[in-house]
Amino acid sequence: LVQGYRYWYGTSVLTSCEAALTYYRKVARVVEQDVNKGGSTVIQRVRLPDEAENPGSSLGLIDDDLIQYYQFLADKGDVQAQVGLGQLHYQGGRGVEQDHSRALGYFTQAANTGNANAMAFLGKMFLEGGPVVSQSNDTALKYFTMAADKGNAVGQSGLGLMYLHGKGVPKDYAKAFKYFLLAANQGWVDGQLQLGNMYYSGLGVSRDYKMAIKYYTLASQSGHVLAFYNLAQMHATGTGTVRSCNTAVEV
């Protein structure tokens, strides 16, 4: 990464976009592999009750007193607090340790009240499996379907993944595309990314690089790492767009 930076800005070497791109590609491929190993879907931004909606707020640590307050609300039956804490413990970060056991408990409480987001996250947990729940396509399908029936974008995207990969259901690219489109139309980043992939590969739809770029761009605006990687690759190779080394590096 440092070498790429040096060639891009001409630090102690002659400025060379192509050389910078070579180094950045190596790093990007490692990141892409790590993200793919980390799970099939992205995690929705955690929103706790009364939290400010500014995009940067998700980067900060959460005060212990605030966590205790949300735990108090969750214990009193506040569904939004239960879902928010479930997400925090599911993914970890912001000063909160990853704890899938607690995440499962909070999601289950909220799902039992009919909360679609909690149902969708239970679907994620069973689709991926782990130390707390055994992987179960049938259980994942049940929760994703319950969430999707309520119009939940995370549930719709989850169903899309199951049909895309034939997990618990016959592989069906047309149905996968349908559910990803429903999710993407609600602004859900994983639906946007998967639509980009389907247009890029021509799965369930005619190959269309312009549409792939459109959906990768939408997903990148929400910060999806794989969307940035795919966009950079397309600009670097001139796939569906005029080749631009500068744009590839900047992305």
Language model regions located:
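Short coil/turn and helix-start
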Residues: 8-15, 57-61, 75, 93-98, ...
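Extended repeat-based solenoid scaffolds, especially LRR ectodomains
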Residues: 43-84, 89
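Hydrophobic face of amphipathic alpha-helices that form TPR/SEL1-like repeat modules
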Residues: 2-9, 84-92, 121-128, 158-165, ...
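Catalytic cores of eukaryotic secretory-pathway lumenal/extracellular enzymes that build
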Residues: 1-6, 21, 209, 220, ...
